């Protein structure tokens, strides 16, 4: 992997999406999960046994395709160096490109972001990708409870995603200002209703957060809201005692709904400095601070400008959105050594391939062909490694990421020096 967590995760998710869309003609697609630390010789021996048993498959075509896939995996295993700290996942099989006879062998070798725990060998019409789903789940979760006398919101912040789990209203009226016994009795009723509301919040919080805590994924609880209600809720025994230990801090807020969660995240930014959401937000805000300077500061944006400055080694931090949708294509001449690299919108690759059929080499007039296709983010990550540039792949689910996507077509940068 590249060594950059956001790039690695983006490429891993992309591979997963592609793999889930692959379908074989029969039960002839092979999936192999090799656990971390497992001897490759043991895996190879197991696969050779499967290769031998595959001769019993009745359909000659299916038998041939299964055997070809196993042989390809055996070849790939020979190229790997032990020990494998994370393990490895290999998919191989004949994938139809159209009608009968259009099948082509496809092989995918993935280094997982977390160690593979269990050996899996599966032969099916689809690649077995269920375990990969677990790898892309953010493990650290923050619980959020926003509360005032009238309403409450319970939610989670997980990576870049804010999820509202429950909204509650109390029905508790405001304080009664008049005097007399009736007023005091009414005030007691109001206080009792407020207490019962706190109990309900605690019950829903326990129901929402205890399963996450038991999975050891709950990093902490953040409490917020206007007034003193949040402090009362935190200090008294409304929360499960194990959850109470997870309270990180309380925050004075103006709101108690989803906007309040965003307000809380702003106020808790120092505490959540390592959370992906805050990393992205702070970095993009830094870019915009440079952008609004009279001379443009240390900002760069757009494909042409960013590519130019990156190849010069002038970029400190590169920001790319997940939805950029560009493929880096290397085309070559059949006749001479002419080579060209171009960026093509991924959804226009078919059109590009058709146009290439009529394109002649500018050097000798020979026919051109596609030598390599690479996701632009993978290409940019390789360039960043060469020039010691940080790269972060941001989600468009956030307001800041969406701004980069819309305004700058998914590519922006902070420079090392003014150009």
Curated annotation (Swiss-Prot):
Entries under InterPro entries matching the protein: eFR1_2_sf (IPR042226), eRF1_1_Pelota (IPR005140), eRF1_1_sf (IPR024049), eRF1_2 (IPR005141), eRF1_3 (IPR005142), Peptide_chain-rel_aRF1 (IPR020918), Peptide_chain-rel_eRF1/aRF1 (IPR004403), Ribosomal_eL30-like_sf (IPR029064)
Keyword Protein biosynthesis assigned: yes
SMART domains attached to this UniProt entry: eRF1_1
Gene Ontology terms: cellular component: cytoplasm
Family: Belongs to the eukaryotic release factor 1 family.
Record's subunit section: Heterodimer of two subunits, one of which binds GTP.
The protein's name: Peptide chain release factor subunit 1
Gene name per UniProt: prf1
